[in-house]
């Protein structure tokens, strides 16, 4: 990669693949900077790759399990502890799934008792800056956009921890 002048390697894969790549970059002592997109990095990944993860960047659109200062993360911890005690961390997929369930619950509050699929979709489309307690930036759905999030923060692995290096960066729709 260095021979070809690659300064950055951007990876969107699963965490096992990105972990292998990070370890190989470190073993080969390459200076190419690694950027992992949302499914390729989280706190469990950092524990897996150890020192090989130092300096790696991650683009993450939702809160981390360790963001205990956020109300949504505290609720997520309470729910997790109710059913699975002694879990010290959860992967990004858990956070993303929790947010999806939270948003579905909010949509179901806005429909009749036995809703149709169309009514549920229309309920989602009423969302304007729905607060997830910091799990995501405020969520808006419209008839033309069903994207719950168009923002992310960039993190960097520093001393074995994912540390935010930006605030949320938002792309206009």
Task: Give short role names for the model-derived ranges.
Residues 1-173:
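Extracytosolic ligand-binding ectodomains
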